[in-house]
Amino acid sequence: MGKRRRARELALQSLFYVDSTSAPPLEALDLFCQNFPPPKDLAQFFYELAKGVINNQDEIDRLIEQHSNNWKLYRMSAVDLNLMRIAAYEFLFCPDVPRRVSINEAIDIGKRFGTAESGAFINGILDSIHLHLGKEEKAEKKR
């Protein structure tokens, strides 16, 4: 398994923990990392993802909700939602990561940690976001 996959899985676990506690998100992340320190070779990408999602969660959640036809975020499984948050963060803030890679990683990790339906659910929402962002970028280039 690649380093980035392992960093994404650790970011998922940390965000799951952050969601389950009443502590401020960055404090909860620090506590998670005290108990489960990320390996040095994963730390940079892990922290970029985990802190990036936490610091941009409102924007990311709005984007997910816009593309999750008739699904409210609170009804989604924590695994599926946090995987989509990680992928959406990569879409918006990690131009070096191809969006298809982010989608495939979220699907594969969702199949491992989520339910039997996680892969298809994650794929549907992330693909919609990917298409939407692609259209916005094309429109920007035409200007």
From Swiss-Prot:
Which keywords accompany this UniProt record?
RNA-binding, Transcription, Transcription antitermination, Transcription regulation
Q: Which InterPro entries match?
A: NusB-like_sf, NusB_fam, NusB_RsmB_TIM44
Alphabetized Pfam families for the sequence:
NusB (PF01029)
- Its GO CC terms? cytosol
Q: Name one GO molecular function term.
A: RNA binding
Which one GO biological process term can you cite for this protein?
A: DNA-templated transcription termination
Coiled-coil-forming residues are none
The domain of life is Bacteria
Q: Which CDD domains does the entry mention?
A: Terminator_NusB
- Which SUPFAM superfamilies does the UniProt record give? NusB-like
Show the PANTHER family listed in the entry. Answer: ANTITERMINATION NUSB DOMAIN-CONTAINING PROTEIN, N UTILIZATION SUBSTANCE PROTEIN B-RELATED
UniProt lists the family membership as follows:
Belongs to the NusB family.
Q: Which HAMAP family match?
A: NusB
Q: What does this protein do?
A: Involved in transcription antitermination. Required for transcription of ribosomal RNA (rRNA) genes. Binds specifically to the boxA antiterminator sequence of the ribosomal RNA (rrn) operons.
- The protein here is known as Transcription antitermination protein NusB
User: Can you name the source organism?
Assistant: Desulfatibacillum aliphaticivorans
